Amino acid sequence: VSDKNKNGLDAGTIAGIDSIGVEASTDIEKALSTEADCVNYTPLASLRLGEDPDLDKKNIIMLLRKGFNVVTTVGFLYPKAFGEDFANEIEDACIEGGVSLHGTGIAPGWLSDLMPLTMSGMSEEINEVVVTESSEFSYYPSEEIVFDTMLMGKSLDQYNQEAGRYENWLGGLFKEAIYLIADGIGSKIINVDESIDLITAEQDYKIAAGVVEKGKISGQRRKWTGNCE
């Protein structure tokens, strides 16, 4: 765990269930001293939050080299999207440890990539693949996700000042899905275009995570387009 307040607690207690006899630790070396075949690596993404944007990559490569299979939701769905050097570094770590890496999620990870590839198997010719996702966060109770990570409730000026890492991280996730689909249907990506529309609140809104004040960001509409040869 990354939260020092959870250090030493039973993992079941943290999850809100009965104790399961597994101690949570902020010491990664201590955690890895146990015998395990696979590590479920699911922190808040370091590309978005924290002092070191590369921390997740460093940790995952370390785990792979030590011989742990890794399942993660921080990205790494299709490392090839970030270039051959990036993909080769991941592959070399897997080979060294004799293990595998599985990046997954709902979207990306299933709905925005695996489903289109599965459904496209029934098509003789594909001219365009369109995937639309709509997410409702007014019922999501996490301030850290809604306000800190997604920058909801910020002014437009605040967003423009703080959004660099957020947009790089989020764009990277969906670019992985785009490259995965393109390779899956036998196309080659020339470039990926990105656009964003920010919607501001017409009045104060009370949501599960707090309050979005009038004039602050209450919605985001994003679009990524992979242009193929």
Q: What residue ranges belong to the model's regions?
A:
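Rossmann-fold NAD(P)-binding glycine/threonine-rich loop
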Residues: 48-69, 73-100
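Short, hinge-like loop/turn segments at secondary-structure boundaries
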Residues: 13-18, 88-91, 119-122, 146-149
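Short acidic/polar active-site loop segments enriched in Thr and Asp
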Residues: 37, 69, 127
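N-terminal glycine-/serine-/threonine-rich beta1-alpha1-beta2 phosphate-ribose binding loop
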Residues: 1-65
